[in-house]
């Protein structure tokens, strides 16, 4: 298995007239590779995976894999709050040729820690494919605790975790209980990439990399090489732009930002709605101040 590390993008899913725009997705993927991105993560939260049909998810993942052609990692979004559905999604990622699957903790039904353990264990037993557990309690209302991550790692059920709590004490606990390099530790929070890597993280699955991929790559490289002063300067420089990517619910602002770059339309699928004119102006201003060239 390839090492799951570096600067990865939670890539948006371009849409046009209500349908997935695969041509725009290919172009976005090629641009990400040209900018130095280490991994493409389709069909995650930012990629609106939960509102794609199964056929659309397959098309998106296949398009990314065929475009990448081994030049970067592909970690396919494959989560569900039904274990049997998650298993089928991970099997699809495996069949299509992804490097790993990103599997969010089950949402809405709020399983216990034992339920979470059995969920990921069942996926592993049914697929024998590398899984990155995705812990984002702010969206799912469940928290995959370090003790459970340690159980899963010991059982070989997960290859990594995308941790989106922005809690550095949590990351230290993970390293303590699981082991520094026992699994891949990937940040799911663009605001804390530097401290996360300093606490043993191996990289990031980033939202802002959709619009500033080279800047995120440079931040990750600086942090991983021990250039803390340089990394801090880069983290601080993108702080305002980071905030504006969440001025409304993700992925609304980032899709608007990608459209402002001229790289795809900003169309969203319901129940997500376009960002307001006021929010769009804030996004545009932050992009200009960061030095991005708008279309």
Swiss-Prot record:
<dbReference type="Pfam" id="PF00701">
    <property type="entry name" value="DHDPS"/>
</dbReference>
<keyword id="KW-0963">Cytoplasm</keyword>
<keyword id="KW-0704">Schiff base</keyword>
<keyword id="KW-0028">Amino-acid biosynthesis</keyword>
<dbReference type="GO" id="GO:0019877">
    <property type="term" value="P:diaminopimelate biosynthetic process"/>
</dbReference>
<comment type="similarity">
    <text>Belongs to the DapA family.</text>
</comment>
<dbReference type="GO" id="GO:0008840">
    <property type="term" value="F:4-hydroxy-tetrahydrodipicolinate synthase activity"/>
</dbReference>
<keyword id="KW-0456">Lyase</keyword>
<feature type="active site" description="Schiff-base intermediate with substrate">
    <location>
        <position position="162"/>
    </location>
</feature>
<comment type="pathway">
    <text>Amino-acid biosynthesis; L-lysine biosynthesis via DAP pathway; (S)-tetrahydrodipicolinate from L-aspartate: step 3/4.</text>
</comment>
<keyword id="KW-0457">Lysine biosynthesis</keyword>
<comment type="subunit">
    <text>Homotetramer; dimer of dimers.</text>
</comment>
<dbReference type="GO" id="GO:0005829">
    <property type="term" value="C:cytosol"/>
</dbReference>
<feature type="binding site">
    <location>
        <position position="46"/>
    </location>
    <ligand>
        <name>pyruvate</name>
    </ligand>
</feature>
<dbReference type="InterPro" id="IPR002220">
    <property type="entry name" value="DapA-like"/>
</dbReference>
<feature type="binding site">
    <location>
        <position position="205"/>
    </location>
    <ligand>
        <name>pyruvate</name>
    </ligand>
</feature>
<protein>
    <recommendedName>
        <fullName>4-hydroxy-tetrahydrodipicolinate synthase</fullName>
        <ecNumber>4.3.3.7</ecNumber>
    </recommendedName>
</protein>
<dbReference type="InterPro" id="IPR020624">
    <property type="entry name" value="Schiff_base-form_aldolases_CS"/>
</dbReference>
<keyword id="KW-0220">Diaminopimelate biosynthesis</keyword>
<dbReference type="InterPro" id="IPR005263">
    <property type="entry name" value="DapA"/>
</dbReference>
<dbReference type="GO" id="GO:0009089">
    <property type="term" value="P:lysine biosynthetic process via diaminopimelate"/>
</dbReference>
<dbReference type="InterPro" id="IPR013785">
    <property type="entry name" value="Aldolase_TIM"/>
</dbReference>
<comment type="function">
    <text>Catalyzes the condensation of (S)-aspartate-beta-semialdehyde [(S)-ASA] and pyruvate to 4-hydroxy-tetrahydrodipicolinate (HTPA).</text>
</comment>
<feature type="active site" description="Proton donor/acceptor">
    <location>
        <position position="134"/>
    </location>
</feature>
<feature type="site" description="Part of a proton relay during catalysis">
    <location>
        <position position="45"/>
    </location>
</feature>
<dbReference type="InterPro" id="IPR020625">
    <property type="entry name" value="Schiff_base-form_aldolases_AS"/>
</dbReference>
<feature type="site" description="Part of a proton relay during catalysis">
    <location>
        <position position="108"/>
    </location>
</feature>
């Amino acid at each position: 298995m390839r090492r799951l590390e570096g600067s990865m993008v939670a890539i948006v899913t371009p849409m046009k007239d209500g349908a997935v725009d695969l041509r725009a997705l290919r172009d976005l993927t090629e641009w990400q590779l040209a900018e130095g991105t280490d991994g493409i993560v389709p069909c995650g939260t930012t990629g609106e995976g939960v509102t794609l049909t199964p056929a659309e998810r397959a098309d998106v993942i296949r398009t990314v894999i065929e475009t990448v052609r081994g030049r970067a990692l592909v970690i396919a979004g494959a989560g569900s709050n039904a274990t049997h559905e998650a298993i089928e999604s991970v099997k699809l990622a495996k069949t299509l040729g992804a490097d790993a699957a990103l599997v969010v903790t089950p949402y809405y039904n709020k399983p216990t820690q034992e339920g979470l353990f059995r969920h990921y264990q069942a996926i592993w037993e049914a697929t024998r494919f590398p899984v990155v557990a995705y812990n984002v309690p702010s969206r799912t209302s469940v928290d995959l605790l370090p003790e459970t991550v340690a159980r899963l790692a010991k059982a070989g059920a997960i290859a990594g975790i995308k941790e989106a709590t922005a809690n550095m004490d949590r990351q230290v606990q993970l390293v303590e209980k699981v082991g520094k390099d026992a699994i891949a530790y990937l940040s799911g929070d663009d605001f804390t990439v530097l401290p996360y890597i300093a606490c043993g993280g191996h990289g990031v699955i980033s939202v802002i990399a959709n619009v500033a991929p080279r800047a995120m790559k440079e931040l990750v490289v600086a942090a991983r090489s021990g250039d803390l002063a340089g990394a801090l300067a880069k983290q601080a420089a993108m702080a305002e732009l980071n905030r504006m990517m969440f001025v409304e619910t993700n992925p609304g602002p980032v899709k608007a930002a990608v459209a402002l770059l001229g790289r795809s339309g900003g169309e969203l699928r319901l129940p997500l709605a376009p960002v307001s004119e006021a929010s769009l102006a804030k996004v545009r201003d932050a992009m200009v101040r960061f030095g991005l060239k708008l279309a």
